């Protein structure tokens, strides 16, 4: 079957491949026929040791997607043949990812999703959405508190803005001027140009928490957090704690219950996404665009 991935361990070049269909599902596993699969900057880590997801090349990349269950292993509960599911899976039980036609998935990591929702929009949700949710859980903010998000224009930052705003949190975000109107529509009370050398001065400080979604901003954001506040970094660069501030790095984990809630938020209009669909056969170009920042702020989604 067609796949976009790597041919050997440590390879960084991504190509169109022909790989075998996944094996029959084992206990607690399902095979999913892919409708759409998300592409993210994290995918470059899957075959270089940065994120060990159990990839066994030649294999497809990708750790998120949506599709129909076409085989069900023993011991699976709540998921049946023909169900439509959305998943972020890591490690990958079949040693191969979602950028293909079929993939083996851990059933406990899959959430049932309605037929009416656009597969391209759904496939853009798992990794970024789960990261945003899990970061906000760590920060533990309540209505009326203030949150600083660096890179609010990115896929994770934009979802975090929307989720925080729904909870009544006041959000200030850094982003490009071209993204400012969109982020205000999402609920940001203030958007600061990240290219302004004095952006941290403009932010004024006194935030209850900071969410770091772009490398190199954590040390400038920390002084803007009040004593006893929180900082959560998504870029593995949380600075040492000071002034009683809890400073932590967060790494996304699969969570079907959180995916179900995100899907509900999407269906009920509380979340908005604008991903760009790309044919699976154009996957190498899509991967390169993501790594070089040529996506115009859109999440790219591969469609077989």
Range-by-range predicted roles:
Residues 190-195, 278-281:
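Short acidic-hydrophobic, aromatic-tinged amphipathic segments that line or gate anion-handling sites
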Residues 202-209:
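A short acidic, Gly/Pro-enriched loop at the edge of an enzyme's catalytic core
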Residues 1, 259-304:
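C-terminal hydrophobic helical "lid"/dimerization subdomain
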Residues 21-38, 50-91:
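Glycine-rich beta-strand-centered segment in the early N-terminal region that forms part
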Residues 78, 88-151:
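NAD(P)H dinucleotide-binding glycine-rich loop of Rossmann-like/cofactor-binding domains
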Residues 125-193:
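Mid-domain Rossmann-like dinucleotide-binding core that forms the NAD(H)/NADP(H) cofactor-binding site
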Residues 215-271, 303-304:
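Glycine-rich phosphate-binding loop and adjacent beta-alpha segment
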């Amino acid at each position: 079957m067609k796949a976009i991935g790597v041919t050997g361990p440590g390879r960084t070049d991504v190509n169109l491949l022909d790989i075998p269909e996944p094996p029959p599902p084992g206990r607690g596993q399902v095979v999913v026929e892919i409708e759409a699969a998300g592409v993210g900057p994290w995918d470059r880590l899957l075959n270089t040791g940065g994120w060990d997801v159990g990839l066994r090349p030649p294999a497809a990349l990708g750790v998120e997607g949506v599709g129909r269950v076409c085989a069900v292993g023993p011991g699976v509960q709540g998921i049946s043949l023909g169900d439509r599911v959305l998943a972020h899976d890591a490690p990958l039980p079949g040693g191969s990812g979602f950028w293909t036609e079929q993939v083996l998935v851990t059933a406990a990591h899959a959430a049932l999703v309605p037929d009416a929702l656009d597969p391209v929009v759904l496939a853009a949700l798992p990794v970024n959405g789960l990261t945003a949710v899990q970061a906000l859980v760590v920060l533990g903010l309540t209505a009326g508190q203030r949150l600083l998000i660096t890179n609010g224009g990115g896929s994770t930052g934009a979802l975090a803005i929307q989720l925080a705003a729904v909870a009544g949190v006041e959000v200030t975000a850094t982003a490009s001027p071209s993204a400012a109107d969109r982020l205000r529509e999402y609920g940001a009370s203030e958007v600061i140009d990240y290219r302004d050398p004095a952006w941290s001065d403009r932010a004024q400080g006194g935030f209850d928490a900071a969410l770091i979604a772009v490398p190199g901003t954590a040390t400038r954001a920390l002084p803007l957090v009040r004593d006893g506040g929180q900082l959560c970094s998504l870029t593995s660069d949380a600075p040492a704690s000071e002034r009683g501030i809890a400073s932590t790095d967060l790494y996304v984990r699969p969570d079907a219950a959180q995916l179900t809630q995100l899907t509900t938020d999407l269906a009920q209009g509380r979340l908005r996404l604008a991903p760009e669909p790309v044919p699976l056969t154009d996957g190498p170009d899509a991967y390169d665009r993501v790594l070089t920042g040529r996506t115009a702020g859109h999440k790219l989604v591969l469609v077989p």
